[in-house]
Amino acid sequence: MNAPSSQRAPDHNPVPSTRVSTVERYDFHRVIQSYLDEAARLVNVPDHVRVILREPKNELIVHFPVRMDNGEYRLFKGYRIQHSNILGPYKGGMRYHEHASLDDFKALGAMMTWKCALMNLPFGGAKGGIKFDPRSVSRDELSRITRRFFHALGSNIGPDYDVPAPDVGTNAQTMAWAMDTYLNTVGMVKKEAAMGVVTGKPVSSGGTVGRETATGQGVVHCIAEWARRAHFKLEGKKLIVQGFGNVGSNTAVLLAAHGVSLVAVGDHTGYLYNPEGFNVHRLKQYVAQNGSIAGYANGQKISREEFFAVQADIFVPAALENQVGAPEAEALQVKLVAEGANGPCSPEGEAVLARRGIELLPDVLANAGGVTVSYYEWVQNRRSETWGIEEVEERLEKAMLDAYDRMTQFAKTHGCPNRIACYGVALQRLVQVYLDREIFP
């Protein structure tokens, strides 16, 4: 359809969920393992290496009490999955979300291993976080929760061992609290200058310029490279984005500089449509002030189903996993899907996209800009250096385009989808290390 129906749901109706309702329980970890198995058949991975990579090296679960503002104490549950460190220190974000689970973190931790290997970074994969809604607590409570969590992890993280970063529900401020906690506890005992214990910090506290926009910038580099190879002019094209946090908002702003217009947007509160295109800078500012797109005046409320049927050219899912199943993929009216989030397309949805000829830029590549610039931050911390924005952006663009080329070359050689090609490239690097080092003892 060219535009959403004029029939709107009443304002008092429940806000549509961003979760796909077609699948009762989505086994994200099993899905990631299926991608590994498919790529492994193309790369001829030794059985013992495949067995090792199917499961994380360490699974950490911590319970810790926090005093809330009302004086009561609440027990929280935190996780850290350390999937692989065969290439270097564990690396991956910390997610605060009410639906966080061990299996999801296992899937996301494994994905970080493939992502770092694809990007030729000297990191392994990890993921973690806390099962709670960060929007439900005060700033002071959030600080205490973060500090107690990182204190509970103790020496299970460190600049040479496991380096966390922001993810869903966390940001630069979260990382500043985490770093300060580590420096005043484990760092004091080890007598080390450990500013690089986390990345994604505020620039004033050891972060790097370009990190805040890095994931969105990486998505845009991939979209621009796809457009160049496809002889597809971005100027005047239309974009829809699901999720308008760090990744979604920065992707929309950066694509606007290429002449791409955002015509539909959604988040956890609902969906909005503007056929003339949103002012992405104003929308981003509104969300920063209000926490969501809810109440934004310059857009028409639409349903979730209408959002996926909006006529556009590019779709960037930048919310959570399992958002694009078969029904959503059938409804999409775009030429390209670029995964800003991790695992937004289910295997069933991806199969429909392939059948309909809609190109897919997979998460393992498309959103790897974040961890790539996190690596640059880590290097600067270790060397006591400060890089300018030009150096960071030039390095990031080259890294993204090099990885894009590795993906397309593998896909062409093996006749496989882009996602499996990314896993294949990553596996080639990992397998070689296992063959070189062999298995202890």
Label each region the model flagged.
Residues V62-P134:
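Glycine-rich, N-terminal phosphate-binding loop and its surrounding beta-alpha-beta segment
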Residues H97, A117-E235:
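Glycine/serine-rich phosphate-binding loop and adjoining beta1-alpha1 elements at the start
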Residues T199-Q311:
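Glycine-rich phosphate/diphosphate-binding loop of Rossmann-like nucleotide-binding domains
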